UniProtKB/Swiss-Prot annotation:
GO cellular component: mitotic spindle pole body; nucleus; site of double-strand break
Name of the protein in question: Uncharacterized protein C2H8.05c
Entry keyword S-adenosyl-L-methionine: no
Polar residues biased stretches: 59-76, 148-157, 199-217
Ranges for region Disordered: 59-105, 124-217
Compositionally skewed regions (Acidic residues) per UniProt: 136-147, 173-188
Record-listed Phosphoserine modification sites: S68
Residues modified to Phosphothreonine: T92
Amino acid sequence: MQDSSKNKQPCVSWKVSPLKAKAMSPDDVSRLFCKSSTSSATRKHDPFHKLWDRLQPKAQSTIQRTSSLPVPSSSNFKERLNNIGGLKRSRTLESSYEDETETANKLSRVSSLVSVIRQTIDRKKSLERRVREEQEEKTDNEDDNDVEISTQESLENNGLAEKKDDTSSLATLEDDIEGQEFSFDDQDLQMLQDIEDQWLSSQKQQGSPLTSDHISK
């Protein structure tokens, strides 16, 4: 009865006396960690067999814990993948939209700069042409003795009025470009125009819809 009650215990303690331990051979020591080949009915008090019985439940419990680890279901895994893919697509669309907006802003700034420079050059050319024509007209009027004085005064008054307007326009233009150490001419305008045309042609080859309005203009 005592043996059966001891066998039901989950862990069995066993001891080897110091004298017996000294007398044990290396083979006997190695058999402490091997399952006994003898039957438990014939050798109930075999410490080697009891050691194996004590270690066996621990191995089984370890296997059970390993096999009982939670595994995510396939539906949740697919849902997470879809969410990640949707997030990546939204970020891609957002970044592409920002790139298109930035490209449109750059094109608008380049076009505005070309327009301003073109208007500035046209104003300067027109002013120079007016001054030159007035000087030539004034010289011709001074050399021509047959011209009446009233006509001469009328032309001079008109010339002074136009010159005053041109002078005010030139002063306004100088105020706009005050502090700048450079000036624009036809060559600068042509260079900017080439840059704009090259950019538009490259965007058109790429099929960008942003250049349709600018190309149509």
